[in-house]
Amino acid sequence: TDPVKMPDFDILAEGKTLSGVAERLMSLSLTDNRGFEADQLTITLDDADGQLQLPPRGARLTVLIGWKGEPLTEKGTYIVDEIAHEGPPDRLTVSARSADFRDEFNVKREVSWHDVTVERVVSAIAHRYGLKPQISEMLMDIEIDHADQTEESDMSFLTRMAEMLGAITTVKSGNLLFIMPGGGVNAQGQPLPSFAITRSSGDRHQFRIADREAYTGVRAYWLDLNYGKKKKVSVKRRKPPKPKKEKSSSREGDYMEGAEGNVFVLRKTYQNEQAARRAAAAKWQQLQRGAASFSITLARGRAELYPEMHGTVTGFKSEIDNQDWIIAKAEHTIDNSGFTTQLELEAKIPEWIAETD
């Protein structure tokens, strides 16, 4: 049998370990989000003796979590934004959000963007906040003819632009990311570390697949002014080459694909083929992300897991085990029942091709 592992953590304020926290800790919860949803930290401490000092709002806390006897994993720096004290028995709850998210992100602006690339827009906004832009190569040179940012914050505008292109945008560790989601790669196209989860005792899971969302492709129409007629472009899954020998699991890999010919048609007619192709690709990726979801609570927490990592799970139904998964959200909790990690996973987006009809 495995030796009993003890959770461990360290909380630093302005670079120094906070003393006396370990004995008072009732719970520590850390949520890693994707997109413009700030990562959250919640710490509840026992104050039955009334000796705890209330930390100042705005204090910066750096958190490391893991297991005793193993190197701890740093999970970022957070700014205290809410403090609650309740009882009896008296306890103090400190809430903090990722230091990467600042109030000035919410300032509404008036900007008109004309004939610019995605790279120009993202870089200009990153520069305004002293952030480093990290943009997926395939998105950099996409041209934006015209876009109005009217009474809209930079982050809201970036999110809207990302949705239009099938991308996601967020701030992590001083970088403004504008990347393709669900591919398991960073902005430079390099693979993120992958994970492997083997089902073990105490783990809980939930798997969901919606057939109505399992489309095989997306079709968009555009107006060819040279010929004065509508043309269509289709985006669909790139079929892997057929294996020479039929394997028993080969059909199971298609379980999440959707019925043949189940094509989503975009109502809008686009002004050119490139715009139609881009809209179809963005919609296809959005549909793929929503088709299947899998959540799992690991009885033995894994601090090294974070959103956009991709990997595999084993010990579940073959349809689940045969799928490549991407972490959409990770929540780490240390309390009196130990250290657990709750993951929300999405199916990794398969490769696709665009065809002009």
List PLM regions with ranges.
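Short beta-strand-centered interaction patches in the first periplasmic/extracellular domains
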Residues: 91, 97-100, 137-206, 212
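An acidic/polar, Gly/Ser/Thr-rich interaction patch typically located in mid-to-C-terminal regions
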Residues: 28-53, 202-357
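Assembly/oligomerization scaffold segments
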Residues: 1-103
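N-terminal export/assembly leaders
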Residues: 101-109, 121-148
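Polar, S/T/G-rich
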Residues: 116-123, 127, 151-163, 215, ...
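Interface-prone segments of viral and bacterial extracellular assemblies
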Residues: 1-7, 11-13, 72, 96, ...
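Short, compositionally biased
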Residues: 77-86, 111, 183-185, 324-337
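Conserved "cap/hinge" positions at secondary-structure junctions
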Residues: 65-67, 180, 309, 315
